[in-house]
């Protein structure tokens, strides 16, 4: 866990604006049972970098609990919270955290919980919704940012883009390993949502990509092998195959991945934020031209000599 703090401090020293923490459960490869806990740790060891949840999974929280935890982090960090919320990622997690809920239906929880949290931050509020009901209550404490911390929604579908704009939320998107056309699709959906809702609110639009900077073939090989390993371990989570032992997703042997287009080295290098500093700069300019306001650097978690490799890639990225 210590290397995550090292990365956060590198990010702050390198001029990054926000550091993000996820929420996942019962998975050793993404140890993040509560994003507010790890952000509290990072808050105590940093001074200025903002602290975001990417994202709190709406269905796993009670609105009162979520409002209070988020507000407490905003309070103790001196008003640095970026409040990101989403539907959740893997069906395996829903089967354990919210039995009976299909991942494809989880957006309904997002649409109910966010307005409730905002009302609780304002003061006394009674809620009678589809998924939660509670008598008059409030958030204790309340956030120090007014009227509330910046809001973010993770979006990859028209219904979520539309909800984000309706509720004045910034938007973060992740094209996974797909090509630039996927980013273009998200921007199109965002623009359509803005137009549909009267063109009165224009959010900050953030895009996340796996990132690795390298100067030679050895660095390239390490990065490609790391992302292939990552994809091989998490394929069963996306497909809900259930091959998880003691929290670790089963690793598909790399030699079995050869020849499959979604693991092709050249495709991955082209689609992801991989390459020399000059190459990555040109890729970033392309996203900037598309209309992406913030870039989220997603580190490779399977690379050899992790702290050293993170440091090299981070340092080069920050130059």
Short names for language-model regions:
Residues 301-319:
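Single conserved hydrophobic/aromatic residue that forms the stacking wall/gate
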Residues 19-21, 51-53, 81-85, 151-154, ...:
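Hydrophobic faces of well-ordered beta-strands that scaffold small-molecule active sites
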Residues 1, 59-127, 171-172, 177-181, ...:
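Flexible, glycine-rich active-site loops centered on histidine and acidic residues
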Residues 1-51, 146-149, 301:
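N-terminal beta1-alpha1-beta2 module of alpha/beta enzyme domains
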Residues 1, 56-63, 145-155, 212-214, ...:
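Active-site mouth loops of central-metabolism enzymes
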Residues 1-10, 156-162, 277-286:
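Short, acidic/polar
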Residues 42, 73, 117, 151, ...:
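Conserved, mostly hydrophobic/aromatic
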Residues 103-140, 181-290:
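An alpha-helical appendage that flanks or caps ligand/catalytic pockets
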């Amino acid at each position: 866990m210590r290397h995550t703090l090292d990365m956060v401090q590198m990010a702050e020293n390198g001029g990054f604006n926000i550091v993000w923490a996820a929420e996942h459960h019962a998975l050793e490869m993404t140890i993040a049972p509560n994003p507010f806990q790890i952000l509290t740790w990072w808050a105590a060891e940093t001074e200025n970098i903002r602290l975001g949840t990417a994202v709190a999974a709406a269905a796993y929280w009670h609105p009162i609990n979520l409002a209070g935890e988020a507000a407490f982090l905003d309070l103790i960090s001196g008003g640095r919270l970026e409040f990101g919320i989403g539907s959740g990622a893997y069906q395996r997690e829903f089967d354990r955290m919210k039995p009976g809920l299909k991942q494809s239906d989880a957006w309904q929880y997002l649409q109910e919980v966010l307005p409730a949290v905002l009302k609780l931050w304002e003061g006394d509020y009674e809620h009678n919704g589809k998924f939660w009901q509670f008598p008059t209550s409030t958030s204790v404490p309340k956030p120090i940012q007014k009227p509330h911390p910046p809001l973010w929604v993770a979006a990859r579908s028209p219904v979520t883009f539309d909800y984000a704009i309706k509720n004045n939320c910034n938007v973060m998107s992740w094209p996974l390993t797909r090509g630039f056309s996927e980013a273009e699709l998200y921007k199109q959906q965002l623009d359509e949502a803005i137009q549909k809702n009267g063109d009165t609110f224009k959010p900050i639009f953030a895009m996340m990509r796996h990132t690795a900077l390298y100067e030679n073939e050895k660095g390239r090989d390490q990065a490609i092998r790391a992302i292939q390993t990552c994809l091989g371990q998490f394929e069963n989570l996306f497909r809900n195959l259930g091959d998880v032992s003691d929290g670790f997703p089963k690793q598909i042997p790399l030699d079995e991945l050869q020849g499959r287009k979604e693991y092709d080295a050249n495709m991955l290098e082209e689609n992801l934020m991989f390459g020399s500093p000059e190459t990555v700069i040109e890729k970033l300019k392309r996203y900037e031209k598309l209309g992406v306001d913030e870039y989220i650097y997603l580190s490779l978690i399977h690379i050899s000599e992790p702290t050293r490799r993170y440091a090299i890639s981070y340092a080069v990225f920050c130059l």
